[in-house]
Amino acid sequence: HILILNSYHQEMTWVKNLTQAVQDVLDSDEFNTIFHIENMSSKRHYNEQYFDSLFNLYGAKYKKIPLDLILSSDNHAFNFLRQNTRILFPKVPIVFSGVNYFKPEQIAEYPEITGVTEAFSDVDTVKAMLKLHPETKDIFIINDYTLSGKAWTKTMLDHIYAANLDTQVRISFAE
């Protein structure tokens, strides 16, 4: 029994592709894999009451299912599992993916958790743009307005300012 816990809703291309890829790789008659897929839809619903409801739902739903593995995608699922795994899924191995701003100490007390982080090179990207197009005066960045989109914007600005790239080119974001 493998639980795939996605942070977002099932209609997002990223979620569809990731879920399908996991099933394609791990679905085998040899292993008789049974998948359980949960989509937290946390870009649409993000408050303490909602996460409490998910805690209660998953507790009831998986109480008698002997999970062998949990695969989580993105920060909300990762954070939810870190906060609740010892109660909901004690000793079940967890592999996360797509986690932003990861620090090893986040899982230091969780030997059952491992995974792959998500990182991008914003400063290197801007430097490459300026090297390829030295006449550039303005860079306009398009991002979404979700919680993670706003966090990316802040992080990018912090990195760009720290590298003094804002003195070479004007950076603006879609507002």
Cite the ranges covered by each PLM segment.
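Short hydrophobic alpha-helices and adjacent helix-cap/hinge residues
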Residues: H1-E175
